[in-house]
């Protein structure tokens, strides 16, 4: 019947979306992970040659936005993002399990889990909504929440309960002047450790048959194939919305991690140069 045909169509659309992301992520990330770790090792060696860490500031550059949180350079939030990714991934997995067509219940359940997933990473604030409006077009209405991430990335949900749409925007500027604070020796080591961890996270999230990331979404999507023929159109549409949202969230987190890694490497490099 038409519902079964629509279910199959939506299933193919979801699988296609995830497959494209997985393919792109593997192509881009594989080469970049190696470079990330090599750059971190190289800078670690250079740190050994720095006699004193007396510099208080470093010249600002375009890289500064990549270490910003709500437009302000913030090492603490960069490190926090790296440490909170596992919690986000576990919540994302739970979200997809709840979204399984055979387990579809009241829409409130979905929104609660969806919100919980975002809260693993950040919290919504009026200032984040205000800033996100500058980065995401056509963002208006009362049902808007914005979650800032390190890397100056903003995850936004828009729409009423059970019909929300997730998107994200990037701020390529920030509230800093010609200089920003230099890192201490300890902070340099923390930053490089975080970069290596990001490389490992990227690898595990995009590994074949991985539990999390795009690979994890693909695994869950495969499980719903047969069930998509047995639910009505409204439920199928809800599944489609949920998967599109969780893919957007993965896009946002991947973007934030990538930006933070680049920014941290540049920050350490600038600190070393300022102390030479």
Could you say what each language-model-derived stretch is?
Residues 1-4:
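Non-catalytic, low-structured ubiquitin/UBL-interacting segments
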Residues 41-276:
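Long, low-complexity or tandemly repetitive, helically biased scaffold regions used
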Residues 6-37:
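Extended amphipathic alpha-helical scaffold segments
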């Amino acid at each position: 019947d038409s519902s079964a045909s629509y279910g199959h169509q939506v299933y193919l659309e979801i699988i296609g979306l995830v497959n494209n992301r997985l393919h792109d992520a593997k192509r881009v990330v594989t080469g970049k992970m190696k470079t990330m770790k090599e750059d971190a090792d190289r800078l670690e060696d250079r740190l050994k040659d720095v006699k004193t860490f007396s510099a208080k500031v470093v010249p600002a550059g375009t890289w500064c936005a990549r270490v910003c949180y709500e437009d302000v350079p913030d090492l603490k939030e960069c490190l926090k993002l790296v440490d909170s990714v596992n919690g986000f991934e576990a919540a994302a997995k739970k979200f997809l399990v709840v979204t399984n067509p055979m387990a579809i219940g009241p829409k409130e359940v979905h929104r609660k889990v969806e919100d919980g997933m975002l809260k693993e990473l950040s919290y919504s604030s009026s200032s984040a909504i205000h800033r996100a409006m500058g980065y995401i077009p056509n963002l208006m209405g009362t049902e808007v929440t914005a979650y800032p991430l390190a890397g100056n990335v903003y995850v936004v949900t828009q729409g009423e309960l059970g019909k929300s749409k997730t998107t994200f925007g990037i701020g390529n500027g920030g509230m800093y002047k010609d200089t920003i604070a230099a890192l201490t020796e300890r902070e340099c080591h923390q930053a490089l450790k975080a970069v290596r961890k990001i490389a490992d996270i990227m690898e595990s999230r995009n590994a074949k048959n991985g539990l999390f990331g795009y690979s994890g979404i693909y695994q869950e999507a495969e499980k719903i194939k047969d069930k998509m023929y047995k639910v009505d159109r409204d439920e199928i549409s809800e599944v489609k919305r949920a998967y599109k949202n969780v893919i957007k969230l993965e896009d946002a987190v991947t973007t934030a991690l990538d930006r933070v890694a680049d920014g941290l490497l540049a920050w350490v490099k600038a600190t070393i140069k300022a102390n030479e």
